[in-house]
Amino acid sequence: MFEIKVSKEIKDACPVFAGAAMYAAVKNTAYNEGLWQEIDAFTRQLTSTTQMEDIKHQPVIFATREAYKRCGKDPGRYRPSAEALRRRLMRGIPLYQIDTLVDLINLVSLRTGHSIGGFDADKIQGTRLELGIGKAGERFEGIGRGVLNIEGLPVYRDSFGGIGTPTSDHERTKMDLGTTHILAIVNGYNGKEGLREAAEMIQTLLRNYTESDGGEIVFFE
């Protein structure tokens, strides 16, 4: 497991922040039918019970948006991933199918409202991560997005540089079909509420769909 430190600048901007990190050995696949049955069921539930305007008021998403503002980012322009995924489904656009690890992280993010970083643990440089705030000119290549302006965004950094924000993770540490160890980080900008449930939900999906024993969970703040 990695050591994860929360910087003073994050603690000042979001004193209630708490996180859960989950590390596990996994076997990734291109597609899993059982997982997609769960994703499709959630999509039907969300679109039949939610209005577009409700999304930003979901408690975890709301707290993440408020943290963006305090860190210096406009959440209307740079949406937290959980919000962006829900808005996508509400517009009638299906969730993109990437691979089983990415898809199951997206499902937990959709269900809980937490923005979750999913990383190939073997691509992370060093054994220590720190959550800070992005700086002007700090280079960050978002997955499928190209260069992302992370100034004012919460960002996890390894010994080489940024690897993940609540808007997008970095191409350098992304999961793919060759991934055999996952590090998933659940970001609780609303505090500890729901963290354990989200982390255990990831564990359950990993056990069900990636031949994993579920790995271990560490909480940090």
Regions found by a protein language model. Name each.
Residues 1-221:
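Charge-biased, low-complexity intrinsically disordered regions
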